[in-house]
A protein has these predicted regions:
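Conserved beta-strand segments of alpha/beta enzyme cores
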Residues: 26, 51-53, 178-180
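Short beta-strand/loop segment that forms part of the nucleotide-sugar
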Residues: 10, 21-33, 55-56
Length: 209
């Protein structure tokens, strides 16, 4: 349900792809059972731009299945999952690609400033990482979300994992590979409201463990 921001997202991504014209891009967009006009807008854009590929779910399956489907459908030499709200800045993609060209197989995007998040969201996020890392032998890096670059070899390794109930942050950490990090301050959400509440994040942490 990102209908308010779909056009803006595409405009920003189109500008980003133009700026990085040395690379060939595809934009795989997953509609996770939206109830607004997100899907119609995405289909309209895809008819005008063949780089845009739209995956339509029959209902809302949730964040992890949607991300898995997008990663599985991507055909590039590297894959960068990201949300449509642009809080994770596309401007960082150039830095990620530079690290990748330098030999990194995974490039993490680490938030160094979460001042645009509410107090409750910052607190819940901190609890999420601390709880998971205290109870699990598999450590996930703090303040690193799903926004990252993964080489094709990493994507292929993820696709071979048998888990049906997927906790992607854990799977990302599990597969390993040579990793680099870029740091950034997260932007405020420009349009719409977050669909991921603190309660969902808490349940997410328990499920991940």
């Amino acid at each position: 349900n990102e209908g308010e921001g779909v056009k803006h997202f595409y405009q920003v991504m189109s500008q980003t792809m133009q700026r990085l014209s040395d690379f060939d891009f595809e934009l795989v967009c997953v509609d996770d059972g939206s109830k607004d006009n997100s899907l119609e807008q995405l289909i309209s854009i895809s008819k005008q731009d063949p780089r845009v590929i739209v995956l339509e779910f029959s209902r809302n399956f949730g964040k992890e299945p949607a991300m898995t489907a997008g990663i599985d459908a991507a055909s590039g030499d590297c894959v960068i999952p990201m949300d449509a709200d642009l809080q994770d800045p596309p401007a960082l993609i150039g830095d990620m690609l530079q690290k990748w060209q330098g030999g990194a197989e995974v490039v993490l995007a680490k938030r160094v400033d979460r001042s645009t998040d509410s107090y409750s969201k910052r607190t819940t996020a901190l609890m999420f990482y601390r709880l998971h890392n205290a109870l699990s032998h598999l450590q996930i890096p703090e303040n690193v979300g799903d926004y990252r670059l993964m080489d094709r070899v990493v994507v292929d390794a993820l696709k071979q994992l048998p888990e049906r109930q997927r906790f992607m942050k854990g799977l990302f950490a599990w597969v390993g590979f040579k990793t680099a990090t870029v740091e950034y301050a997260r932007d405020a959400r420009l349009v719409g409201d977050s669909k991921f509440s603190g309660w969902k994040l808490w349940n997410f942490a328990i499920e991940g463990i």
